[in-house]
Structure formats: structure tokens, C-alpha cells
């Protein structure tokens, strides 16, 4: 047993845990009627091939029964203003954080951040292919599904009580690393993922 000094962010996390609540479920005083979810609705149609219904907003936990946005709702509105809803994308020149080939920052709602992150990784990793007898076999450096699920996990499950924090996408010659804010009480980071390139590269 040991005592660990908590900062304000860690204290907030403990309070939320003690009350069995999460940051994203907390209601705000922002009227949902003043915001739109067009990007979310269009993405829902594309992914599910079903029609969007505004009733989903409450069932998804994005608005309250009295028409207020939750913190999660703020992250999905078209004009997201949550400061820490950001990603930093960097393509490094080699195996370490030395010089950069490209670096870009995006601040937007979670649907667009997911798109921007996937696009950046596609643009700065190899997508080779080999010709087979009757078709072409694509050989990308990284599984598209693994990239998608990794980014979703880091965007959704990151600690949004960390003000000024953001998700980092770092691409090296041999790997892609995803890092998001969040740590155990002793400071040990828990939100870290790296993907290795296929040997077919």
C-alpha cells in the first residue's frame, strides 16, 4: 500500500469513478437544438445502409431527455468546439523522432478526426500489390481494419479530462504508433498502441 498524490485531473477521474459516471455521459447546459449532427447522420447511413432517426441521439447518449447535449454529444456535433478533440499526425524520416516528412494537426468532431487519421496513414504508408492470374492482390503495409479499430479505440476511450491532450499518430519506417491521453495513478501510460509493417513490404 502507498499514498499517491493526485492532480486535479486525476481527482476528477476518481470522483467520476466513485459516482459510477463517465465524463462523456455528463450533461451540459448546451441546447441540442442549436447544433446539428449531419456528418454523424450521413456516416451512419453509409456504414449501416439504414435511415437515420434523430431519436438515436438520446439512445446513443449524445443528448439528454430534456434536450441538452452531453459531453459525448459535444464531441459529435458538426461544429465541435471541444478543445481537446484533436489529433496530431506526423510522418518521421526514419525509426525515431528525428526529422519529419510531414506533420499536421486537426481539431474537429470525432467522425472527421477518424477520417483525417485514416487518410493520413494511407497517404504515408505503402500500398503495394501483386498481379495474380485473374485478379490483383493488394498488399498494404498495415491492415485497414487494424488501423480503423486502433484509431476508434484511441479517439473514443482516451481520457478527455486531460485538458490540452490529443491523440498522436506517429508513422515511422517500420511501424505506426498511436498514443492517447490517459494514465494510471502512478503515471504509467496505458493508452499506447503500435502496429508493425507486414513483412511483405
What are these regions (language model features)?
Residues 2-196:
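Active-site helix-to-loop segments that bind/position phosphate- or nucleotide-bearing substrates
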Amino acid at each position: 500500500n502507498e499514498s499517491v498524490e493526485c492532480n486535479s485531473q486525476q481527482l476528477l477521474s476518481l470522483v467520476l469513478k466513485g459516482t459510477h459516471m463517465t465524463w462523456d455521459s455528463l450533461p451540459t447546459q448546451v441546447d441540442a437544438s442549436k447544433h446539428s449532427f449531419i456528418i454523424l447522420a450521413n456516416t451512419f447511413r453509409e456504414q449501416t445502409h439504414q435511415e437515420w432517426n434523430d431519436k438515436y441521439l438520446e439512445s446513443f447518449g449524445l443528448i439528454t431527455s430534456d434536450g441538452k447535449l452531453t459531453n459525448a454529444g459535444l464531441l459529435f456535433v458538426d461544429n465541435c468546439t471541444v478543445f481537446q478533440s484533436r489529433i496530431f499526425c506526423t510522418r518521421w524520416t526514419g525509426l525515431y523522432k528525428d526529422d519529419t516528412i510531414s506533420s499536421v494537426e486537426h481539431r474537429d468532431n470525432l467522425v472527421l478526426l477518424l477520417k483525417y487519421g485514416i487518410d493520413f496513414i494511407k497517404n504515408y504508408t505503402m500500398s503495394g500489390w501483386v498481379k495474380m492470374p485473374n485478379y490483383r492482390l493488394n498488399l498494404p503495409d498495415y491492415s485497414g481494419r487494424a488501423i480503423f479499430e486502433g484509431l476508434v479505440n484511441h479517439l473514443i476511450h482516451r481520457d478527455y479530462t486531460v485538458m490540452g491532450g490529443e491523440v498522436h499518430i506517429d508513422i515511422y519506417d517500420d511501424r505506426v504508433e498511436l498514443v492517447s491521453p490517459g494514465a494510471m495513478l502512478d503515471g504509467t501510460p496505458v493508452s499506447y498502441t503500435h502496429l508493425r509493417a507486414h513483412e511483405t513490404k
